[in-house]
A protein has these predicted regions:
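Charged, glycine-rich active-site and insertion segments that engage polyanionic ligands
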Residues: 1-52, 56-57, 63-127
Length: 127
């Protein structure tokens, strides 16, 4: 078993963009290039993106609460401003929405529509 670091980095970059846009720290247009790329990757499963999203949300929570032990240390400088922008309630809502998406995976949902909806719902929930 091996880890394809290039694919992981690509997913992480996309999910970080999703979080930045969802937190209203970036315009929706920033997400569009990733959304289109995800749509083209028809064989790539949404679960792989959700795993990365959960790790990033964990890091945001740790940083927001003053902790130091994050998993994505190499992007700390990108995560810190975002962690300072969002509230605990926003992170909780983001986790709940990701959980809801995970539940829908069995229904063969459209990845990009689901992720776009996640962004819009979080943007509406306030940072």
């Amino acid at each position: 078993m091996s880890i394809d670091l290039e694919q992981y980095d690509r997913r992480r970059t996309a999910m970080l963009a999703l979080l930045r846009v969802a937190a209203d720290a970036a315009p929706f247009s920033e997400w569009m290039k990733y959304s289109e790329s995800i749509a083209r990757g028809k064989r790539e499963k949404l679960e792989l993106y959700l795993k990365v999203l959960y790790m990033l949300l964990r890091d945001l929570l740790v940083l927001r609460e003053g902790g130091l032990d994050i998993r994505n240390r190499d992007i700390r400088l990108q995560l810190e401003p975002l962690a300072n922008k969002v509230s605990f309630a926003w992170i909780r809502t983001a986790v709940k929405k990701a959980d809801d998406l995970a539940e829908l995976l069995r229904r063969n949902i459209q990845k990009t529509i689901a992720l776009d909806a996640l962004i819009l719902e979080l943007r509406g929930s306030g940072s």
